[in-house]
């Protein structure tokens, strides 16, 4: 009589338990990395937007107003005060969105500096604890 090949039910159950234990250890670490990566993207975007705003100020002796917003970096603002020395291609090609699909916000003059650039964070609610702004860069 030939012996049948294959795995017993007990062997399969042991493998499933081991995979479950490994998954319970790995998944929480992956979730934390996603949050860190999202925050790092926001920081990178804020640094790039700050640089573009500084170039705007060098050319026009002022930052765009809150009403003109960050869109003033892509196309010349139509509202007063008009940009005097606006480059043909703008200061950036397009405005990035934060990792949660929202637009970055500009407050000029800012509450924390000359200009505040910020993301509303994961909850999308202004002035909540998860907002990330150019004034928080370097802080935990």
From Swiss-Prot:
TM regions (residue ranges):
7-27
At which residues is N-methylphenylalanine found? Answer: 7
One Pfam match, by short name?
N_methyl
Provide GO CC annotations from the record. plasma membrane; type II protein secretion system complex
Assembly description: Type II secretion system is composed of four main components: the outer membrane complex, the inner membrane complex, the cytoplasmic secretion ATPase and the periplasm-spanning pseudopilus. Forms homomultimers.
Which keywords does this chain's UniProt record carry?
A: Cell inner membrane, Cell membrane, Membrane, Methylation, Protein transport, Transmembrane, Transmembrane helix, Transport
This chain's source organism reads Klebsiella pneumoniae
**Signal peptide (residue range):** none
Instruction: Output the GO biological process annotations, alphabetical, semicolon-separated.
Output: protein secretion by the type II secretion system
Compartments, record wording: Cell inner membrane
The pro-peptide lies at: 1-6
Q: What does this protein do?
A: Core component of the type II secretion system required for the energy-dependent secretion of extracellular factors such as proteases and toxins from the periplasm. Pseudopilin (pilin-like) protein that polymerizes to form the pseudopilus. Further polymerization triggers pseudopilus growth.
Its membrane topology: Single-pass membrane protein
Q: Which family does it belong to?
A: Belongs to the GSP G family.
NCBIfam families from the UniProt entry: IV_pilin_GFxxxE, typeII_sec_gspG
Q: Does the keyword Protein transport apply?
A: yes
**Family annotation (InterPro entries):** Bac_GSPG_pilin, N_methyl_site, Pilin-like, T2SS_protein-GspG_C, T4P/T2SS_Core, Type2_sec_GspG
Region spans: Disordered? 120-140
- What's noted about post-translational modification? Cleaved by the prepilin peptidase. Methylated by prepilin peptidase at the amino group of the N-terminal phenylalanine once the leader sequence is cleaved.
> What is the protein name given in its UniProt record?
Type II secretion system core protein G
């Amino acid at each position: 009589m030939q012996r049948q090949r294959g795995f017993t039910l007990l062997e399969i159950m042991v493998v499933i338990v081991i995979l479950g234990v490994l998954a319970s250890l790995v998944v929480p670490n992956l979730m934390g990395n996603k949050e860190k990566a999202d925050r790092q993207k926001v920081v990178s975007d804020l640094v790039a937007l700050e640089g573009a705003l500084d170039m705007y100020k060098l050319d026009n002796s002022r930052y765009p107003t809150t009403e003109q917003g960050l869109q003033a970096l892509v196309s010349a603002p139509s509202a007063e005060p008009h940009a005097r020395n606006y480059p043909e291609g703008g200061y950036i090609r397009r405005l990035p969105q934060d990792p949660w699909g929202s637009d970055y916000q500009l407050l000029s003059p800012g509450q924390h500096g000359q200009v505040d650039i910020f993301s509303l964070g994961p909850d999308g609610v202004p002035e909540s604890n998860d907002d990330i702004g150019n004034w928080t860069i370097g802080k935990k």
